[in-house]
Amino acid sequence: VNLSRRHILVLLPTAAIAWKFVEAGTPETAPNYNMSSHWWGMLIDIPKCIGCGNCVRACQAENDVPDGFFRTWVERYHVTDTDMTNPEVISPDGGKEGFPAAAEDAGKYFFVPKLCNQCADSPCTQVCPVGATFVSPDGVVLVDQKYCLGCAYCVQACPYGCRYIHPEKKVADKCTLCYHRITKGLTTACCESCPTGARQLVDLKNPSDPIHAFLKTHSVHVLKPQMATGAKVYYNELDGSVR
């Protein structure tokens, strides 16, 4: 998309209006939902993930994700004793239908679900020329597709590879932590479908949230901490080879 300076200046006020609308609450939120009382994130408990693909399928069904694109996906890592820093990583069709049988050889296998990291200091929001993507007051990175130009600047800026341009709508799309669900007191589709509890939604502003306590008592990590994005997807027992 070719964006002239005049085009951007014309669109910026409408994007600001969109932000005020979202800040006040959207039709997707429950009437009594208070954005400022929450700060959403997620825990991925790697030892519990069995690579079944339930989360990927549930996400695609819940959010009408087009074939070949993913708001969340699962990777399988194979770390061998001979090369512990360069694992084999596969994710056939996003792990949607599971994985082939592991080879009977040395090393270890484990699964790593990935999704938007809901960064508090998100690179994607900083490069959007019209403010169509933003961090909501409750900590979820959203895209107002009415104002998105489809320029893909945000797709290129995301260090986690979590965005794509919708092939039909021609606008940016990504995981929203099932915003239409969590603002009504429900959990995300991926968390609800996980048979082992490997994925857990967490309200970081709620000290009584059991996952909040887990984060304080376990050595959890975020992906690519050197990027200093304020990522809020936390991984328990994250192997150093994960990239």
State each model region's role:
Residues 12, 16-20, 56, 63, ...:
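A generic secondary-structure signal for well-formed alpha-helical elements
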Residues 25-32, 61-107, 134-147, 162-180, ...:
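Non-heme iron-sulfur electron-transfer modules
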Residues 19-54, 226-228, 234-235, 243:
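C-terminal segment of N-terminal export signals and the immediately downstream linker at the start
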Residues 1-16:
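N-terminal secretory signal peptides and thylakoid transit peptides that target proteins
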Residues 189-243:
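Long, compositionally biased charged/polar accessory segments in the mid-to-C-terminal portions
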Residues 42-58, 62, 108-131, 140-161, ...:
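Cysteine-centered iron-sulfur cluster-binding motifs in ferredoxin-type domains/subunits
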